[in-house]
Structures are given as structure tokens and as C-alpha cells.
A protein has these predicted regions:
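Short, polar/acidic, helix-capping and beta-turn segments at strand->helix junctions
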Residues: 1-130
Length: 130
């Protein structure tokens, strides 16, 4: 059983907590980054384009472990920016991907830098493997 918990103020498109029954198979995914198949940064200087690539890569990670966006329980979304408008633009990409339709809880963070030169977005995820 997986359920969405929304006991606090109404969350925009995520849950305040996710509950998973013991014995459920989980996948803990490393950060999805905006690299193409050749290992090059996609959308240099463009956090929205990078978020799109990150979501595409996240879907591939999920597929590889036998899961999908509907089974994501938790994400942490890292954006190299101190501007809430930039964080919101990246979050809109996350919402548009369909990720927010599941029981997932999320944290959206503005950070100083990420691991690759030119990288502006990274998303880590935990998902149920049905």
C-alpha cells in the first residue's frame, strides 16, 4: 500500500509525506543530471531545458529498475539559483512530466553549485518497484 498524506496546508502538487507498507521493494536513484547519451550538458545556461533533460533521464533510470513516475515516493530537486522564479520554472517542468500525479513528497532547493560544469538542475528520487 502506498498513500498520499496531505494533513498540513494543501500542497500544490506534492504530498507532505508518503507512506509505504513494509516489505515493499524500493529503488533509491542517484541524482538524475542533464547529460545526453555522450555525457555532454544539455541546455547550458537554461535551467528549464536542463530540467526537461533531467526528467527524461529520470524516466530512463526508473524504467531500468522496473518502475515509473507514478511510483515515485520522494524527490529532491536541486537548482543552481537563489531566485524563486527560476525554482518555480523548474518545478513547472516537474509538474508537466506527470511526476506530481503519484503519492510523492518533494523538496525543492536552490543551491550554489552542482557536480558538472554548467549543470543547473539535478533530481534524486526514491520509487516503489511494483
Amino acid at each position: 500500500m502506498i498513500r498520499r498524506v496531505t494533513a498540513l496546508f494543501p500542497p500544490p502538487t506534492y504530498s507532505h509525506a508518503s507512506v509505504v507498507e513494509a516489505g515493499t521493494k524500493l529503488a533509491f536513484l542517484a541524482g538524475s543530471v542533464p547529460l545526453d547519451a555522450e555525457g555532454r550538458i544539455v541546455g547550458e545556461g537554461d535551467p528549464v531545458r536542463q530540467a526537461e533533460q533531467v526528467m527524461a533521464n529520470l524516466q530512463e533510470q526508473l524504467k531500468a529498475v522496473g518502475s515509473d513516475l507514478a511510483h515515485v515516493l520522494h524527490t529532491e530537486v536541486y537548482v543552481v539559483s537563489g531566485e524563486t522564479s527560476v525554482l518555480s520554472a523548474v518545478w513547472e517542468v516537474v509538474e508537466a512530466s506527470g511526476l506530481s500525479t503519484g503519492p510523492h513528497s518533494s523538496t525543492l532547493l536552490g543551491v550554489a553549485c552542482l557536480g558538472y560544469t554548467g549543470q543547473l538542475v539535478e533530481i534524486t528520487a526514491t520509487a516503489v518497484v511494483p
